[in-house]
């Protein structure tokens, strides 16, 4: 075999190896893109389900549905009395209608692997609650935490929750957290976070409860990055 024949054979082998590698890279990229697309489609589907379920009640309940999968109740007079954590009768009536429909959506099998956490968030204005702490921020942390916990407690006492299967209850206990954010994320007159907008705080809008769905997007991105580093 001549030297030129040997080189030709090596070039052919190298070409096939290169083509095989390129095809594997393209296949992996297509698989990653499919995972991302499926995830984005699921997030969009959850948002559409929430809009479809509650669009008619938004105005009556003074509720906002965000594309970030947050639901915000912004009428403080309806939700809690000033400085108190007990759920008002008016808000109880809203929760009786809202919570079963909300969790019926999230407990769908197709969303089970897409949800990482369901946050019940309590938010306050900057009014100091010295009965709870000499530090106004901590006093409002405690108040907002109590409020979110009261909402969760109310949900767990509902007949809807009691009638769920044990598997569904375990799933919700894994997902749901009650969080108090004090006045760390107050809102302005446009219901935007005042820290980011640099606008004056609207105390009424800031006193609120939010339900927020945290998806598994961070885990998805981490897995993709790990795959790319292999």
What is each of the regions a protein language model found here?
Residues 67-98, 127-140:
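Short, solvent-exposed beta-strand/turn patches at coil↔beta or beta↔helix junctions
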Residues 226-230:
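Short, cationic low-complexity segments
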Residues 84-119, 152-166, 211, 219, ...:
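Periplasmic peptidoglycan-binding/anchoring modules of Gram-negative envelope and division proteins
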Residues 1-56, 61:
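Short terminal targeting/anchoring segments
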Residues 38, 42, 46, 90-94, ...:
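Short amphipathic alpha-helical segments
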Residues 89, 123-218:
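Periplasmic OmpA-like peptidoglycan-binding domain that tethers envelope proteins to the cell wall
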């Amino acid at each position: 075999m001549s030297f030129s024949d040997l080189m030709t054979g090596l070039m052919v082998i190298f070409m096939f190896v290169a083509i095989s590698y390129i095809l594997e890279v393209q296949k992996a990229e297509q698989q990653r893109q499919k995972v991302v697309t499926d995830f984005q489609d699921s997030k969009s589907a959850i948002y559409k389900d929430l809009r479809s379920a509650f669009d008619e009640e938004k105005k009556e309940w003074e509720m906002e549905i965000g594309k970030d999968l947050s639901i915000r109740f912004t009428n403080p007079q309806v939700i809690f009395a000033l400085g108190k954590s007990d759920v008002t009768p008016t808000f109880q009536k809203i929760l009786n209608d809202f919570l079963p429909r909300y969790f019926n959506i999230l407990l769908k099998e197709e969303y089970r692997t897409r949800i990482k956490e369901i946050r019940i968030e309590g938010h306050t204005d900057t009014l100091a609650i010295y009965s709870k702490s000499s530090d106004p921020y901590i006093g409002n942390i405690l108040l907002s935490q109590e409020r979110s916990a009261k909402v969760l407690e109310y949900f767990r006492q509902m007949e809807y929750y009691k009638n769920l299967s044990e598997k569904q209850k375990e799933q919700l206990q894994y997902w749901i957290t009650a969080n108090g954010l004090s006045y760390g994320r107050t809102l302005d007159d446009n219901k935007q976070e005042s820290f980011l907008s640099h606008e004056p705080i609207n105390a009424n809008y800031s006193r609120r409860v939010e339900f927020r769905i945290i998806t598994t997007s961070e885990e998805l991105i981490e897995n993709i990055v790990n795959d790319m580093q292999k």
